[in-house]
Amino acid sequence: MSQSLSSASSSGAPQRVRTRFAPSPTGFIHLGNIRSALYPWAFARATGGDFILRIEDTDVERSSQAAVDVILEGMQWLGMEPDEGPFYQMQRMDRYKEVLAQMQAQGLVYPCYMSVAELDALRERQMQAKQKPRYDGTWRPEEGKTLPPVPEGVQPVLRFRNPVGGSVVWEDKVKGRIEIQNDELDDLVIARPDGTPTYNFCVVVDDIDMAITHVIRGDDHVNNTPRQINIFRALGKEPPVYAHLPTVLNEQGEKMSKRNGAKPVTQYRDEGYLPEAMVNYLARLGWSHGDDEIFSREQFLEWFDLDHLGRSAAQFDEAKLRWVNAQHLKATADERLAELVAPRLAARGIAQSELADGRLPRICALFKDRCDTLVALADWAHVFYGEVTPNEEERAKHVVDAVKPAIAALSDALAQCAWDKASIAAAFKEVLAAQGLKMPQLAMPVRVLTVGTAHTPSVDAVLELLGREKIAARLRTA
């Protein structure tokens, strides 16, 4: 980013919406994190704006490229690619130091030599006096004030001269009007003794340089917002519009976090969830469009706005997520499902040549209404390409001696009939009539022997897709 702080446009023309997602790469990205990316991405798409990815990696000890890769992988899977970025804060240190020097020259910051021990003692006195712990301005230059002597060999921090008196007010798009008295805010450290800038300062410089118009983030950042607004205004810039999203709770009602058992977003991919189902579910986890529960990505982007963001914490419900996924599976084209299932079958040893026989889309069509994940659909599909082990309990219940002659007769009839659903159904009728049986008495054991369970879609459709040779071999195990 090359835009300087002094060159931002002040024209009256409507600004192009520019949003950002700014994760810290200190671990995997979970659903609570990714929802904080979903809404700014959706708002940028809905308004024809830009979505920027910024990696806030100033915590060098905890940040890793592996964590960045997981963030990028999760966003790519969900189809939330940024228009710009990723930008890395550690690569912008020269820019931050340039702005710090500018602020020092303007008297907006000052060096503070108070030691950690002195700060701890100050906090202890304030707490004993039942006061809010805060920096007391010992080193803040004021007219007529004598500062303490500068201690030898001590590198100072730089503190921002927070305004005295008045208040910080903003109209939050989720929380409404928020007002914080400046007297509640102490002078924030914006550079450490080694000169490295701190989070709240870097964020403001980035948001200005990247021309961010809307900051949509978790409400754990609310306390940072008045401090950031004051830095914006000290630099002569108006802050962006803020929308602070309520917390996402896990199923136990706790804040979703890695410590509380949250899973990486990519694990949901591995567990067989569709990206469009995840977007649908996450969208509803804090936003609504009337009573619509199931919608496409295109509908979401058409409908999304900031006015319908919820104010209450949303609770994750995996059973509901599976239901949403099941609805999307049913609505997904069979060819696409086949493309998604094929790699899962290949991972289980099914040769690519077998998968190219044209059956897989038809198998997906037959079973998708019974499945809530791609894993479940792949399990069904595997029956048609791999080996099958009948459920022992169902085998004992249905494959009884009394029905074995009928199974043998059906096997003979299927060996000779034309291979289509109608001919297979006719073979069943012929054997049932000859053996004096009803359909369930024969269909149930045939299902158990051929696909492993007594509960399947129409038996003639299943057998047609299984193929004559597999059926003959499996019926011989009766």
UniProtKB/Swiss-Prot annotation:
Protein name: Glutamate--tRNA ligase
Top-rank taxon: Bacteria
GO cellular component, one term: cytosol
Catalytic activity: tRNA(Glu) + L-glutamate + ATP = L-glutamyl-tRNA(Glu) + AMP + diphosphate
Gene coding for it: gltX
Sequence motif 'KMSKS' region, location on chain: 255-259
Family listed: Belongs to the class-I aminoacyl-tRNA synthetase family. Glutamate--tRNA ligase type 1 subfamily.
HAMAP family associated with the record: Glu_tRNA_synth_type1
Short sequence motif named 'HIGH' region, residue ranges: 23-33
PANTHER family: GLUTAMATE--TRNA LIGASE, GLUTAMATE--TRNA LIGASE, MITOCHONDRIAL-RELATED
